[in-house]
Amino acid sequence: MQNAVIVYLTRQRDLWYFVHSLKLLFKNLNTDNKYPVIVFHDDITSVIISNILVELHNFLGYLPNVKFEKIAFTLPEGISTDPAKYAMEGEHPTLQQFPLGYRHMCRFFGGLIFNHPSMLKYKYYMRVDSDSFMLSKVSHDPFQWMADNGYEYADYPLGTDSPKEVEWARRGMWESAKEFIATNSERISNPPSNWEGELYNTNFEICDMDFFRKQEYQDYFKHIDTTGNIFYRRWGDHVIRWLGIRMFMKPNGVGKMTELNFCYQHGSFAGNPKLATQDSIDVLPEPFKGCYYKCLKGE
């Protein structure tokens, strides 16, 4: 057993599918309840939390090790509170659909989470999104798999962002990253010469937080953060993560959770859908169940 924690960041309006994600997490991955789960949130009441825990107990037959922790997001110093700033002139319309809370999430997972007080005692963390579903047993402990292979990061490749979204973020993100590379070349072991919009699927990832707590990564994140463009241009944590790993991590430090050979669904995308078990599919809420069957048919 590794020193690890599983993390969600959710909100009250997403609870109708988040609870199903939790059920499938304990059913198929955290089966013996050995790893704690922290659910960060900013608006879930104590009554609703109690109801969720009762529902989980009824489903699992035991009370899982789940802690709900309220988090207060604040804008970094110097960031405008004018809503108009978050729909920049010329910004692609799809980017304007992401509310301020989404951009707080990008900042949190991009760099703040690693030194959050509730995370400091852990080495590894697994992030699971509210609309992430494990649809078959994960037979091997993912954290042990990380340690055995010397991985410092792993994701589950699944689906892609819109090319227009990537292109919009890429315009300024790569320029900012190049500025950091130019002034920190002696600290960067593997500086990228170009970036074509590659990213990681951070909706389901495992991080060795010892790596991400290192000063060089934290300085890189601070450089990105101070531009304000996590908020103004929706620079995502998946993009921040890819460039930081590319700069500072050894080439063989990244694993792919597809190696663990299980079915994972995020939103409307499913990986290894033929491995899903019927008793897990039955737990899926609509419309996610319909999305799964479309993936199974290859639609």
Positions of PLM-derived features:
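N-proximal low-complexity "stem/linker" segments adjacent to membrane-targeting elements
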Residues: 1-20
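Short, charged/polar "capping" segments at the starts of alpha-helices
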Residues: 15-16, 43-52, 163
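Short, acidic, metal-binding catalytic loop of nucleotide-sugar glycosyltransferases
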Residues: 23-34
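Short internal beta-strands
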Residues: 36-43
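Active-site-proximal specificity loops/subdomain of glycosyltransferases
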Residues: 56-121
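Conserved catalytic core of nucleotide-sugar-dependent glycosyltransferases
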Residues: 86-106, 132-228, 234, 238, ...
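Short beta-strand-to-loop acidic/aromatic patch adjacent to the donor-nucleotide binding site
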Residues: 120-135
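C-terminal catalytic/acceptor-binding lobe
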Residues: 200, 220-299
